[in-house]
A protein has these predicted regions:
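C-terminal functional module detector
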Residues: 1-106
Length: 106
């Protein structure tokens, strides 16, 4: 698949870790992608709560003022669609990358 280096924090908690309940909640994303990024979305409890568009292939961004949630994750979308083959072959490469979630205590 597309080789994307993606790091995601909420406050001081790295993806896969747990952050203390009680805001403010601040996301930080660092990414190294093979091409420019159409959008960076921050999701909280499955809902998109922040979107940044037209980012370079290598970036570091901070998003302030996230709403309280039970978990957060980051999703990157690069240009291009998902390649579909007329068979049951499922290619690993696509225009997306996701972080692991950051969980909120309690």
């Amino acid at each position: 698949g597309a080789r994307v280096g993606l790091k995601f924090w909420v406050n001081d908690a790295f993806m896969g870790q747990t952050v203390a309940r009680g805001g403010p909640y601040i996301a930080r994303v660092e990414a190294q992608c093979p091409r420019e990024v159409e959008s960076l979305e921050i999701l909280a409890d499955g809902e998109i709560v922040a979107t940044l568009r037209d980012l370079p292939a290598i970036f570091s961004e901070r998003i302030d003022g996230l709403p309280e949630a039970s978990w957060y994750y980051a999703k990157i979308t690069m240009p291009g669609g998902f390649v579909e083959y007329p068979s049951n072959i499922a290619p690993a490469e696509g225009p997306w990358a996701w972080s692991s979630p950051v969980f909120v205590e309690g």
